[in-house]
Structures are given as structure tokens and as C-alpha cells.
Amino acid sequence: MSGPMIDATSDHAPSGMDVVVRGGTVVTMDPARRVIAADVHLRGNTILQIGRVKPPAHGARVIDARGCAVMPGFVQTHVHLCQALFRGMADDLPLLEWLKQRIWPLEAAHDEQSLYASARLGLAEMLLAGTTTILDMGTVRHHDAVFTAIAESGMRAFSGKAMMDTGVGVPRGLRETTKESLAESDRLRARWHGAEDGRLGYAYAPRFVLSCTEKLLRGAAEAAHATPGVLLHSHAAEHADERKAVRDALGKDDISALAACGITGPRTVLAHGVQLRAAEMRALARAGTRFTHCPSANLKLASGIADIVAMRAAGMLVGLGADGAPCNNRMDPFTELRQAALLAKVKRSDAGAMRAEDALAMATIDGARVLGIDAHTGSLEVGKRADLAIVRLDGLHSEPGGGAVARLVYSCVASDVTHVFVDGRAIVADGELRTLDAHAVRDTARREGARVRRRAKL
């Protein structure tokens, strides 16, 4: 006899019970890119079965996913949780002015309390939209507060404090010596890398070439490579003005400067790449360096449109990221999915330049590959971690036609997400956060955002 079938959102469903996601369209993103009508059986933190699932004898929590896509959770490979409080405070400025006039003063004004509130705001937004893994770059100080917020939220994440030991216009609150920067990064790595049963990882984060000495870049590379699984995370080739400033200061481009210091290779994730030349793409591909496409941020800061089609053709591995709230202003993966697909078509004057499936891959399995964790997440396959999102496909904005993948990329929005699991844990159920109080997050963000702005005198 079959065991009892208990609804997943029931107050009486025992924690730790198996979960069966029943009757959805499963968008696996596996090597065969299968899209199948199937059930997904979760046990603990693992995907146990995909197919026709009989309820286990000991019972299961059941989610009715009819009319929904069951997909891997989104993997965002470049975000700034520390900037979530700054939404709407830095609009309509180009990159370097945006940094010097708004972002750096605001970051310098953070204290531990405001940074914690900022991280919770960004995490809540992304989790509700189906994001299950992030690569985050923090600000210079108080980064334990970010890791604490991530740990409490249930998000899978790599994160690291920003490293800055030089730069024009850097406020006092962001200034640090090379020794201080490396020592604090090492302390954070020792404390947080591998924490939460491996759900958290560390990424050394030299901000960009203009804010880091050669000594700091080399030190970050050496430190990252000394510990398995630790990443390097920076910005590169984002804006023409930035590239000119680097050439004026160093006599070479930022990609050359990073490569000379060891900030390349399979454990390096660089954001943007808008200004990359073809020869640089080929060299980065040979080195195995990963990149993140941030289409909305690149548009808002007038950086340009990254040639993602050329990057992928050169052999580069590219993920997707919303970047930060003050340069987007959303942290919504559905926005980035759609933008990535549409902008590739415009960049190439070719409607077929990027298919919906390719865009979805960047936001899921390719994002996991960028972070080196594709053996564990990024696709729905038996034995992988239970990181998934359930997304309604029956909204008026998605009907009446189109396959599940096309609907996810071109039609769906964040509010279509009903459930999110990370490591088998229900983080979002029926559109509501289970790990964070959304109302408290919003109210605290309003209060702390006002305090930061006053301290920054903006």
C-alpha cells in the first residue's frame, strides 16, 4: 500500500520527509537538454528520481506542479549584495562617475547593521525569483555580515570582500593596505569557505585593476590557488573609459594586467567583457578564464553590448548575473535571461544568434560550470543537489503557445515562481519566503538605506 500523500505547504508535513514534485514539465538542462513530463523525487538534499514516481511507503510531501516548469534554480555569477540598499540612489551616471560619486561613498558609509540589511534585501529578491546560487562581491569591510545573511537565507553562494589598496577618488572608509586586504580575505576564507555543509564558498575579489596594486593582484591569485575550490572574482573590460584609464595608468589593458598577475584561468570569474577584442577572447578561452554577462547593467551604465556570441564561439564559458541594484535596478534572473537573448540578436543582426535554450543554459548549467560546481548543481539529474525552482507557465503573459524553454526565457517573470528548493530545503513555498520575513526585510532596508545615505551625505 502506498504511503500518505501530504501537501508540501501543509503545517503538518514533517520536516525531512521526502518531496515529490508531481506532474510538471521538467526542464532538465542535462547534456541531452531533455524537456519531459515527469515527477521529481527529492530525498534529503539530493534528486533521487526523475520520471514516474510512486510515493514512498514512508510518505512524502507532494507539490502539484501541473501547468508549471520544474527547472534548475538560476545561477547568478556576478552580484553585489552590499549594494542592494543603494537601489535608486545612483541612476543615470556612467561607470567611473557612478563609482566615485555614488557607490564608493555609499559603500564607505556601511556599518555592520546596514550591510546585513542590504544582503538580506538582495537575497530575498533573488530567492523569490528562483535564484539558488550566486557569486557575490562585497565591499571592503564588515563582510562577515554578508556571509551571516547568506547562511541564514539558505542560498548557495560564493562570496568575498572587495580588495582595494589604491585608486583615485577612493574614500577613507574603503582604503586599506595590501597587507590588511590580504589578511582579512584570508581570515574570511578560513572562516567561511566550506561552511554550511559546503553550501558556502570563498572568492578572493580584487575589485578591478584601477583599485588594486600589482602586489595585491598577485597576492590574491596566490592565496586563491592555495585552497581547493576557492575562486577569484573581478571586473574587466567593462567600459571604454575604464579601459582608457587603465592604459593611461599602466601602459597596457586590464586583461593583460590581470593575466600578468595570475588573475586568469579556470578559477577566475571576470564580470562584463563588453570591450573585449577578438584576440583577448581567444587568449582568455585558452586560459580557461570564465566570464559573466550582465546585460541590464551594461545597458544602464552605457557600457555597451557584450558580444556573447563571439565569446562563446571562441570557447569562453559565460554565465549570467544581474550585477547590483543601483546599476540594474533589479536582481531578477528573468530580466537578464530575456535581455541576453534579445541583445545577442541585435548585436549580430541575426534573430537566431542566441536561442532561448542557449540563454537558459547560461543562467543554469553554464553558470554552475563557471563556478566549478556543475557536478553538483545547475541541472536536474539524479544524484545532483536538489536546487530547483517551480515556475508557472499558465500566466496570461505566457499563454497560449510556445514550449517551456521559450516561455521561461521570453515570457515568464519573477512573480511566476511558486517554489524554490536549495539543497533540498524549501526556501520559497507558494510564493512566500520561508527563511526570511519579507516584510521585515523591506522595512529594515528602508530604515538602513536612509541611514547610509545620511552618513554618505548624499
Describe these PLM feature segments.
Residues 87-155, 181-197, 446-454:
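Alpha-helical scaffold segments that flank or form the walls of functional sites
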Residues 146-274:
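Metal-coordinating catalytic core of metallo-dependent amide/deamination hydrolases
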Residues 1-38, 43-48, 53, 364-458:
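Active-site microenvironment of metallo-dependent hydrolases
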Residues 260-267, 309-395, 411:
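His/Asp/Glu-enriched, well-ordered alpha-helical/loop segment
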Residues 24, 40, 45, 67, ...:
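Divalent metal-coordination and catalytic microenvironments
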